[in-house]
Amino acid sequence: MKRFLASLLFVTFGIASLSAGEVETAFSPDGKIRLSFSLSEDGRPQYSVDCGELPAVLTSGMGFELMGNSDDLISHLDREFEITGTSRGEFDETWNPVWGEEISIRNHYNELLVNLKQRQTGREMNVRFRVYDDGVGFRYEFPQQKSLVYFVVKEEHTQFAMPGDVTAWWIPTDHYTQDYDYTCCRLSEIREVNSKRMNKNMFSPTGVQTSLQLKTDQGLYVNIHEAALVDYACMHLNLDDKNFVFESFLNPDATGAKGYLQAPMHTPWRTIIVSDDARDILASRMTLNLNDPCKIEDTSWIRPIKYVGVWWEMITGKSQWSYTWDLPSVQLGVTDYTKVKPHGHHGATTENVKKYIDFASENGFDAVLVEGWNEGWEDWFGHLKDYVFDFVTPYPDFNLEEIRDYAKSKGVEMIMHHETSASVRNYERHLDTAYTFMKNNGYNAVKSGYVGNMLPRGEMHYSQWMVNHYLYAVTQAAKYKIMVNAHEAVRPTGLCRTWPNLIANESARGTEYQAFGGSKPGHVCILPFTRLLGGPMDYTPGIFEMNISKFSPGNKSHVNATIANQLALYVTMYSPLQMAADLPENYERFPDAFQFIKNVAMEWSESRYLEAEPFEYVTTARRVKDSGDWFVGSTAGAEGHVSKISFDFLEPGKKYEATLYADAPDADYKTNPQAYTIRKMKIGHNSKLVQKCAAGGGYAMEIREIKK
C-alpha cells in the first residue's frame, strides 16, 4: 500500500483575519487525538492537544524572540499575528526501512497548515501540524519573503503546558552530556532534585532534556521530543514549576545565539506522542515518519552488525588506550614512539586483537571493534588540544596490515574507532583522509566519539554548529559507503530514516557507566520510552561478570543487572548494531547463557510490545525477518516484576519450541546476579507464561517453529 492523498485532498482557505478565541482543529485519522490552534488576544499563536476526553497538553504558546531590542516588535515573532489562510489534507503511505523493528511502517496523518502574518511588520510564519493516531508533530516554516530573510534566534518560545503536577521520568539539561541516570518524580519536585547536582553546564534548576516521558493523573502517557533535527540547535525544556509549563530552550552556540537562520527554512518537528497505554509509546513510529525518506540510492552495503571488541577491558581499567607512561605530551608527526618504553597495559596490541578475532570467528560474530589503536592517547583528554589525533597512524604494537589480513582470513570485519576528543575542527580536516584510509583497509563501519570540551573553544555539544557537524560526518561517510556509530553526539531524532548508514548512537548513559559506579536497575526500562524513540542505541549489553574487581582489582564497581536481564536487552533495546561487550573469558564461563547472544537475530519482520511501564518493566517480542521464529525479552527494574504474557502473537495452528533463559528463584542483581535457569517448553498460539523477574532481572526467550 502506498497512497499519496495529501496532494489530492488539500484545500486552502483564505482568511482575512481570525478573531481571538476562534479555533482551528484537526483530528487524528482514528478521530481520537484532537489538535486545536488559535490566536490569543495579542495575536500570539497557541495550541492544545487532547486524547479522547482527556487533556494531554493544555493551551500553550508558540513563537520566537530574535536578537535585537527586546522592546521592539521586530525582535518578536510570537505576537501580533493574524491568520491569512489554512489548508488541510490527509496523507497515507507505507514505507520500508533499510533496517528496523519491522519491515514496513505506515505513515498516516491528517495535516493542518496555518499561514500567519504579523500585522505591523508583514513578516510571514507558517505552522504545520501533523496529527497521527499516536500523537502530534508540528514545526515552524518561514517562506521566501522580503520582510524576513536572515535572522538570529535568541529564544524559541514553544510551550508544553501540562495538565497539573504530572509524573515525569527525566534527566537534567546539560550542554555537555546526556549520560545521566533517570529520575522519576512529580514536576514540582524537579527543582529540589536538580539543586543537589547543579553545575555550569546546566542552564536552569528546572531544565530537563528530551525525550521526556510523562504520565498524567488521568492515566495518559505523554512523550515530548523532536524529529528531523537539521541545521538547528537541540531542544531542551525549561519548566515553570508554578504553572507546570515547559518551554523550549535551544542549546546556544559559543556566542550565545540559538540559531542563525535564513528563509525559506523550517525548524525541526516538535513531537508529542500520547496514549493511555504505555505500550503504544514504544510502538510509535511518529518520530521516524516525520523525517525525510532515505537519501541513499543504493543501500545494499548497509547491514546489521553483531560484534565484540577491545573496549570493556579499557573501560573497566584492565587495560589502557595509551601505549606508554613516558610522554606527558604528544606531538603527532614529531613524537617517536619507537624510542619510549611501553607500559605493558596497552589493550590494542596485535596479539590481543587476534584473540578477539578468533573469538568472533569461532562464535559467529560479524566484526571486532578496537579502541586505542592509534597514536595520541597519552594526552588526548582535558587539554583542549586541536591536533590530537590523525586517525591513520597506529601505535608500534598494532600491526594494521597484519590484523586486517588475519581478520579477512577468519571471515571477520574490523570496526574503526575515531575518538575526536571533541576537537571537531581537527576531525573535519582529516575526515576524508580518515574515511579513505578505512576503505583502503577494509573497514566499513566506524565508531566515533566526542569526549571533552569542544573545539572550536566555547562551542556546545548540541548547538546548531555541532548538530550540523554530526550530520556532516554521516553524510560524508555515506559517500564512502561507511556506517557510523556516533558516541557523545546529539541525541537522535529519527534521521536514521533519511541516512540509514547512521546505524546507532550512544547519546545516553550506556553500559560503560556500570563500570563507573553503576546505573539504576530501572535505567534499561526507561530508555525504550525516551532515548530509543529517536533511533537505536549502541548500549553495549551482555555483561556476565558483574563484580568488576574480579578481573580489574582497582575497580570496585558492580554491574546492576542479572545475566538474564543482560540477555533480554538484545530484544528490548533495539539496535541494528549489537555488541557482546564482556570479556571473552567471561562468556566462556557461561557457555549456555552465551548461546542466546550467539543465536539472537539482528533483523526483524515485526515487533510486539507485550508489557510496559516506564522505569519498572518492558517485555517485547520480535519476529525474525523472513521467518516464523520469535525472540522475547523482558527487563525489570529495582522492584522486580511478575511477567504475565500470552503467546497469541504466534501463528494459530502451529507448534513451537521455546528456550527460556530466566532468573533463578534466588537471583538478585546485587547479591546473586549470575543465578539463572534454562528450560525448554512446547508452546502455541493459546499458551501463556507467568514468569517472576528478579530485581534488576528479566528473561529472554528463543521461540522456534517446529517444522512438520
Please give the residue ranges for each predicted region:
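Bacterial Sec-dependent N-terminal signal peptides
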Residues: 1-23
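N-terminal accessory beta-strand-rich subdomains and adjacent acidic, glycine-rich linkers
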Residues: 23-297
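Edge strands and adjacent loops of beta-rich recognition modules
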Residues: 98-106, 594-622
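An acidic-aromatic substrate-binding cleft motif
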Residues: 262-357, 363, 367
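Aromatic- and carboxylate-enriched substrate-binding clefts and catalytic-loop regions
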Residues: 371-558, 562
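Catalytic cores of secreted or luminal carbohydrate-active enzymes
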Residues: 564-611
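Carbohydrate-binding surface patches
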Residues: 614-656, 700-702
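C-terminal beta-strand-rich structural cap/linker in extracellular carbohydrate-active enzymes
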Residues: 680-708
